[in-house]
UniProtKB/Swiss-Prot annotation:
Sliding clamp subunit that acts as a moving platform for DNA processing. Responsible for tethering the catalytic subunit of DNA polymerase and other proteins to DNA during high-speed replication. This is DNA polymerase sliding clamp 3. Belongs to the PCNA family. One of its GO terms (biological process) is regulation of DNA replication. HAMAP family: DNApol_clamp_arch. One of its GO terms (molecular function) is DNA polymerase processivity factor activity. The keyword Iron-sulfur does not apply. It holds the Pfam family PCNA_C. The lineage of its organism: Archaea, Thermoproteota, Thermoprotei, Desulfurococcales, Desulfurococcaceae. It comes from Aeropyrum pernix (strain ATCC 700893 / DSM 11879 / JCM 9820 / NBRC 100138 / K1). InterPro entries: DNA_clamp_sf (IPR046938), Pr_cel_nuc_antig (IPR000730), Pr_cel_nuc_antig_C (IPR022649), Pr_cel_nuc_antig_N (IPR022648). Disulfide bonds: none annotated. Keywords: DNA replication, DNA-binding. Homotrimer. The subunits circularize to form a toroid; DNA passes through its center. Replication factor C (RFC) is required to load the toroid on the DNA. It comes from the Archaea.
Length: 249
């Protein structure tokens, strides 16, 4: 009998989330409590943090058999398994002692068992950052903007205008400016207390693109020369958040 069981309706959502997570962190510890399933970890350079939370109500079945369960995973291994997820697949995760069973269910059932990673769980605090700018957009808008900038710059600069968000990238050969606004339909919501700006390594934004593919919406929050917070919102109240430290020039 499994120590814990999590049954989710859409395996591909987890496929896309884990594809982004594994580009930033190698290993991590999931913590399941009565409220939900969570993960919080820093990358090795301490430039980026990944913060995942899914409420228990988002699962078809959520059974932890006690107050809490912790299980460590290699995201490289988990991502390789989840790449096999098809459009119609449901996902079951079962904690079986020192192993994690990953089941993909549709017309049949495929089971992959991978070893848990033994690591000390360190509860990281949530970053204390005040944001003056908040822009909410579709996942497709976020993906297209980052892809337009990727070939031309190693740095992404966010600039808050009065009624629009400006994304800027430049190199010796080209400068790219992308303006997103509610009036043009590219933003779902926009708030700017001041016209702040901040710059970040575009590499981290590129690594978020898989997760954005499955997101209902993406929220970008930042302040002058402060860490950016990028929230991926998913069906059922799930959330995958990335914090990235700024590049100070």
């Amino acid at each position: 009998m499994a120590d814990a069981r999590f049954y989710f309706s859409d395996a591909r959502t987890w496929r896309y989330m884990v594809a982004s997570i594994e580009k930033i962190i190698e290993e991590g510890v999931f913590v399941a409590t009565g409220e939900g399933l969570s993960l919080r970890a820093l990358d090795t350079s301490h430039v980026a943090m990944v913060d995942l939370y899914y409420p228990n109500t988002a699962f078809i079945e959520y059974d932890i058999g006690g107050e809490s369960v912790e299980f460590g995973v290699s995201f490289d291994l988990l991502s390789k398994v989840l790449r096999r997820a098809r459009k119609e697949d449901e996902l079951v995760l079962e904690v079986e002692g020192s192993r994690l069973a990953v089941k993909l269910k549709s017309r049949g059932e495929r089971t992959f068992r991978i070893p848990q990673v033994v690591m000390t769980y360190e509860k990281l605090p949530e970053p204390k950052v005040s944001f003056t700018v908040r822009a909410r957009m579709l996942g497709s808008t976020f993906r297209e903007a980052v892809r337009d900038l990727e070939p031309h710059s190693e740095t992404l600069t966010l600039r808050a205008l009065e009624d629009a968000l400006l994304l800027v990238g430049s190199s010796e050969m080209a400068t790219v400016e992308i303006e997103l606004s509610q009036s043009r339909g590219s933003l779902l919501d926009y708030e700017a207390e001041s016209q702040d700006r901040a710059s970040y390594s575009i590499e981290y934004f590129s690594e978020m693109l898989s997760a954005a593919q499955a997101a209902d919406a993406v929220v970008v929050s930042f302040s002058e020369d402060a860490p950016v917070r990028v929230d991926m919102e998913y069906l059922g109240g799930g959330r995958l958040t990335f914090y990235v430290s700024p590049k100070i020039e």
